[in-house]
Amino acid sequence: MEKLTIRDIDIKNKKVIMRVDFNVPLKDGKITDDTRIVEALPTIKYAIENNAVVILLSHLGRPKGERKPEFSLKPVSERLSELLGKQVTFVPELYGEEVKMAIDNAKPGDVILLENTRFDKGETKNDPELAKKWADLADIHVNDAFGTAHRAHASNVGISQYIPSVAGFLMEKEIKFLSKATLNPEKPYVVILGGAKVSDKIGVITNLLNKADKILIGGAMMFTFLKALGKNVGSSLVEEDKLDLAKRILEEAKEKGVEFVLPVDAVCAQKIESGVETKTFRINDGIPEGWMGLDIGPESIKLFKEKISGAKTIVWNGPMGVFEIEDFETGTKEVAISIAAETEKGATTVIGGGDSAAAIAKFNLKNKVSHVSTGGGASLEFLEGKELPGIASIASKKKIEN
């Protein structure tokens, strides 16, 4: 069912408490990547334009219920002020007199950022008392934090028990694209999965085996599948306790008529380092002991490009190799270029959060795909077909009866 968004309700001159995801990386108190702040701007600006008083809530890192200065949102308020071109009032508290005064003194269109929600241990416990304190500050709750949608916390879920909760624009976009990719994908539907472990992607594989036409596997997880097929993978990373599961997945794919594509060669080295000697081995010939696969090889890239070509829906989650090191980035880069090319031909392309999002950004292709998810764990659970608590708590559009 479709969710209500900030667009569907009247927020003019109202007090709006908005859960955003400002969980940005910091180094020596400076923000090293402000992407998450930038992603939240459209919803914040919309509320400002509608003369709402905007009260922002976010977590940052894992302070575990303690006030730790290195996890303060103060640097975020400074960056947000620059991006909005207006002063954001930072209140180093979560509730109480100082917060109430800031809100009482606010004029329509003002923005207030409260301190890190996880400075109170009630946040991660979804404590109803804490949720009520926040709900009492405002008329409406806007949830724009997809990155925490897989968590039931006080600031995104608990608060919806007391005041109406609607989706912000970023949340709306995430739901739209991830739903399109999981519920009603246009065919041919190609899923590309990478990363280190099969165990991280089991849920996604089993859910998407019912929907995908092709599943392409890269990254270190490919070696668990290849070893399950009896191939020699040398010293590559293998989850020994998942070999039977890998066999079962391969059998299930066969039964369901899903084309399950594994790499045919790998770029290998003896150490995961830059500038080391690399060799490409064909999988059928085997990888010698002491060598480990760190990227898909040139033949695999060619094969993957053929399989991606002509797709109408593509979901990509997890890199093809150790793309952070230039010697092992080619597979990930070429797959990303392929996905961008299909997007240009009209395909819907969704990139899961985390490492794939980092890869797409590294190769400057972020604007060449349909959607890059802002949530790593959240997008993974969505692709697994799970209902996320942070989405379930948003009010649904009522079906209008004739």
Curated annotation (Swiss-Prot):
Q: Which InterPro entries match?
A: Phosphoglycerate_kinase (IPR001576), Phosphoglycerate_kinase_CS (IPR015911), Phosphoglycerate_kinase_N (IPR015824), Phosphoglycerate_kinase_sf (IPR036043)
Task: Show which residues constitute the signal peptide.
Answer: none
Task: Please classify the protein's predominant subcellular localization into one broad category.
Answer: cytoplasm
Q: How does it assemble?
A: Monomer.
Q: Which SUPFAM superfamilies match?
A: Phosphoglycerate kinase
Organism from which the protein derives: Thermosipho melanesiensis (strain DSM 12029 / CIP 104789 / BI429)
Give the pathway annotation.
Carbohydrate degradation; glycolysis; pyruvate from D-glyceraldehyde 3-phosphate: step 2/5
Q: What is the official name of this protein in its record?
A: Phosphoglycerate kinase
Q: Which UniProt keywords apply?
A: ATP-binding, Cytoplasm, Glycolysis, Kinase, Nucleotide-binding, Transferase
Q: Which family, according to UniProt?
A: Belongs to the phosphoglycerate kinase family.
